[in-house]
Every structure is written in structure tokens, then in C-alpha cells.
């Protein structure tokens, strides 16, 4: 891997992440890299500015923070095929990150320069909000196109998940969502909402809603109702090429809010719909571990060990 140009992105509210960012920049500059540092957080989004002002894209983006910082980076960098090296500094679970100890010494940069790493491709989703009237859809029923940039209120990307929930401040309401898969209405879900998750996001909100754990090597979409009020509304896993359309049902005040990776996107009115499908691009995640184990990660992060807590595993 070339390290001519590197972006170092650090979590905005973390002093340890800021200190590590300064150290990474110092080490990379000593190797001759052109380094740009920027902070990222819930109220700070550096990527539109970086992508608009930098003459050339970086060879690598080093992301220092937790999973939320990584998710924000992936949503903007994946479409440009920029590799992401994520390191947990100031984060919590850190499903998508390396341990902070990999930063000790400058061996990490030499490994990258010597191509001693692997690249994981993580599936992403795209949501497109269709605000056209029924008459406009009848005149132009073709599917909405996937743009190359997330540049407006109608197009959004997610590495973990999208979810839709009722949008009311004064009460805690339920909502009714009609789910259409590949042109066929399969359910009208009444409950707290609906999650559409990638395999990467299957260990997050979708898991809490009763969904399955999917290995990230699989491309598929998890469709998980949130607290449905019917036993027949169940989680399903659909192929990655499935086209899912979600329609809010009810009166005009039954608005629905769309969220991406835990960040609010936009609000849908009854009569509008949200189209979710696999994005054309994947997140490119740098993997430094020589023997990575997804199952070991799940066991350690979610304390998923079963009977291993009571007995030693066999050697078979």
C-alpha cells in the first residue's frame, strides 16, 4: 500500500483520540506522507469539505474512535474506494476497530507499506426517498437511480442499518409500515418500526430486535420488525439484490423518521416511500490481525460464550 497521502480522522469529543491523531500524523510525516487531520462527530462532519477541497484522494484513511466514527467515515469514503484503517480510541464495543495497542511503535506503517494486511469488503445499503405523487409514479414507474454521492435529502447510505420509526415528540406511538419486496407486498407491520440491516449491522439494533447474527462474509439484508404487535410479523433475511420499499400508512399526522447508522436522515409523510437496496460500493476495511476470527470478536464483545463459561472447550 502506498502512503503518499493519508487522512487521520479522530473522534471529536475524545482527548485520547486527538492525542493519538497527533502522534500518527507525526509518524506518517516522518515517512514522507502528506497528512491531513480532521475531527468527526455527531455535530462535526469533515468529509464533504475534505472531498471538495483536496486535490487528490488519500491512499488511506486512519479513523481513531469508536464504531460510530467508523460508520460516519464509511458512509462518505466507501464510494471512493478509500481504504479505512479503524482503531478503537475512546470507543465502546469496537466491533469494527482494531485494538489501540496496534499503534505502539511504527510497525503498523511498515506493515502497510510492505502489504502485510488484508482487505475486508463490507456490504452497504442505500436508501432513496421517493416523494413523488401517485400520478407521477404512474407516468415514470422506473426505479430510482443510485447516485455516486450522498448530496441531498433523498439519498442516504449505511454500513450498519437503516430503520424507520414513528416521528412524534409528544407521545410514544406505534406506526404501521407496509413492506414491499421486489414488487410484492409481504406485510403490513404495526409496531415500533422496522430495521433493514447489513450483515455488519446484524450484531447491533437488529440483534436487539430479535434478528439473527450474519457473518460479514455473506451479502444479505436482514428485515427486522421492532416490537411488532402481531406474532406473524417476523424477521426475514432476503438476498442482497432485493429491492425493498417501505410505505408509511395512516393519516397525515402519522409521519415516519428514517435513521441511518443511528443518525437521523429525514421524515416521510404518508404517500411517500423509502426504497432500500444494496449499494453499488462496499466499505474497504483494512485488517491487520494475522488470524482474525469473527466468532471470537462476537464472543468477546457480546459475551457470547454459552457453555464455555462453565467448562473448557474440547480440543477436537
Swiss-Prot record:
The protein's required cofactors: a divalent metal cation
Catalytic residues, chain numbering: 67 (proton acceptor)
Listed GO CC annotations: cytoplasm
Main subcellular localisation: cytoplasm
The keyword Metal-binding is annotated on this UniProt entry: no
GO molecular function: ATP binding; metal ion binding; NAD binding; NAD+ kinase activity
HAMAP family to which the protein is assigned, alphabetical: NAD_kinase (MF_00361)
Protein name stated in the entry: NAD kinase 1
Amino acid at each position: 500500500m502506498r502512503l503518499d497521502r493519508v487522512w487521520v480522522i479522530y473522534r471529536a469529543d475524545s482527548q485520547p483520540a486527538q492525542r493519538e491523531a497527533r502522534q500518527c500524523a507525526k509518524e506518517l510525516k516522518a515517512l514522507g506522507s502528506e497528512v491531513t487531520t480532521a475531527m468527526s462527530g455527531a455535530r462535526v462532519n469533515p468529509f464533504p469539505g475534505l472531498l471538495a477541497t483536496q486535490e487528490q484522494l488519500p491512499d488511506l484513511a486512519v479513523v481513531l474512535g469508536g464504531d460510530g466514527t467508523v460508520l460516519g467515515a464509511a458512509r462518505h469514503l466507501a464510494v471512493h474506494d478509500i481504504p479505512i484503517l479503524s482503531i478503537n480510541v475512546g470507543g465502546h464495543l469496537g466491533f469494527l476497530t482494531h485494538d489501540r495497542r496496534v499503534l505502539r511503535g511504527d510497525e503498523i506503517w511498515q506493515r502497510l507499506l510492505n502489504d502485510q494486511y488484508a482487505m475486508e469488503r463490507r456490504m452497504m445499503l442505500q436508501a432513496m426517498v421517493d416523494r413523488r405523487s401517485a400520478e407521477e409514479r404512474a407516468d415514470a414507474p422506473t426505479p430510482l437511480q443510485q447516485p455516486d454521492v450522498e448530496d441531498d435529502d433523498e439519498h442516504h447510505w449505511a454500513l450498519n442499518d437503516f430503520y424507520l420509526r414513528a416521528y412524534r415528540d409528544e407521545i410514544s406511538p406505534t406506526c404501521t409500515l407496509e413492506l414491499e419486496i421486489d414488487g410484492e407486498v409481504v406485510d403490513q407491520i404495526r409496531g415500533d418500526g422496522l430495521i433493514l440491516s447489513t450483515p455488519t449491522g446484524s450484531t447491533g439494533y437488529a440483534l436487539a430486535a430479535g434478528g439473527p447474527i450474519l457473518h460479514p462474509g455473506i451479502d444479505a439484508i436482514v428485515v427486522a420488525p421492532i416490537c411488532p404487535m402481531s406474532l406473524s410479523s417476523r424477521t426475514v433475511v432476503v438476498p442482497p439484490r432485493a429491492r425493498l420499499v417501505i410505505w408509511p400508512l395512516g393519516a397525515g399526522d402519522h409521519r415516519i423518521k428514517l435513521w441511518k447508522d443511528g443518525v437521523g436522515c429525514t421524515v416521510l409523510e404518508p404517500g411517500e416511500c423509502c426504497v432500500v437496496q444494496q449499494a453499488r460500493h462496499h466499505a474497504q476495511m483494512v485488517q491487520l490481525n494475522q488470524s482474525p476470527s469473527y466468532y471470537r470478536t462476537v464472543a468477546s464483545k457480546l459475551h457470547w460464550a454459552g457453555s464455555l463459561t462453565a467448562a473448557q472447550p474440547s480440543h477436537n
